[in-house]
Amino acid sequence: GEVLEESIDAGIDWIHLDVMDGNWVVNETITFGPAVVQSVRERVGPNIFVDCHLMITNAERTWKQYADAGVDLIIAHIEAIDDPATLISEIRESGTMVGLVLNPDTESNAILPYLSELDLVLVMSVVPGKGGQSFMPEVEGKVRTFRAAIDEQISDGGRKTKLMIDGGIKAHNASMVASWGVDVAVIGSGLINDRASIAENISEIRSK
């Protein structure tokens, strides 16, 4: 709760929640479920954008619990779902925004066919769920592929899909990924650490 309040006081207006079920991620990590997500929503209020990154095996059966918990956007792993088109349609019909995410070793073609229906594409720059990893710069080509496809889609009058990157983003590489064309960078330990306050870390990142 204190971290949430400090983040909001520092100017954070988008909160990214990682949901892991202990099965799909490589290190068997379990984080939290819909009840905690709902408590986050209630704590931060309606003006903070909240997304939910589902690193789970059964997103197609459980996503509605997270929509009902009040998230603005649900992001599901393309590698963990059987019928992306149906899932996208169902989430959208619920009134919740929808995104797809892909792992560093998954080709962009896995998501590109669904791009026109997505509010967001998330490119992982570390392996999901495995702590202590370094940023993987080799995802640059994938990020730029999505940037070009989204720009073309927008120029044709299509959906203004956001492009997000997640994994190992800190002050020293934030400007680099921005130059690749990402709209949103997920920052965890680069923001919340013992080295400085959240506000100080934000200031450092923005100054790069």
Task: Describe the predicted segments one by one.
Residues 181-187, 193:
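Acidic, Mg2+-coordinating phosphoryl-transfer loop and its flanking beta/alpha structural elements
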Residues 168-180:
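Acidic, divalent-metal-coordinating active-site segment for phosphoryl/phosphodiester hydrolysis
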Residues 1-73, 81, 93, 97-98, ...:
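Conserved N-terminal beta1-alpha1 strand-loop-helix module at the mouth
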Residues 19, 78, 102-104, 125-126, ...:
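Short secondary-structure boundary segments
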Residues 128-133:
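Active-site phosphate-binding strand-loop segment of PLP-dependent enzymes
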Residues 106-109:
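Alpha-helical scaffolding within the catalytic cores
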Residues 151-158:
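Intrinsically disordered, low-complexity Ser/Thr- and acidic-rich flexible linkers and loops
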